[in-house]
Amino acid sequence: MVVLVIQISYGGMTAGLKAGHVSDTWPLMFGKWLPPNLFNSFINIFETPQTIVFIHRWFAWLGIILVPVVFYMIKKQNYPADVQKGLLWLTGVVALQITLGVLTILSYVNIVIALLHQANAILLLGLAVYFIHRLRAVDETKA
């Protein structure tokens, strides 16, 4: 949940600073995995559009890694059907979010795609809260 909140926060900064216009290529920025001058100053992580969009992109990669890990852990624990169904929904919405994010970049921030990306972030946050709530409810009944 912490990763998701940070990611949504950086998404908000990306939109607010119009940082999505910084680089219209993916996965590289300016032809590099690590563009120069990203972290010249600590304040760059809050003020510099290039650094903000870089962090937003890399937190997406972290999500790509974490979702299968969580998926495997939940499947291994044999949670009830509604929790597993919620996990499938969560996985699908994460995949949609990443797809919309990449399409937003490649379309040079087409407003419709960008708005869908933001709306889907709200859906993703709601699903994550619901999913965590269900996990805790199941864990309490097991205890």
For every predicted segment, state its role.
Residues 1-143:
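Polytopic transmembrane helical bundles with strong interfacial aromatic enrichment
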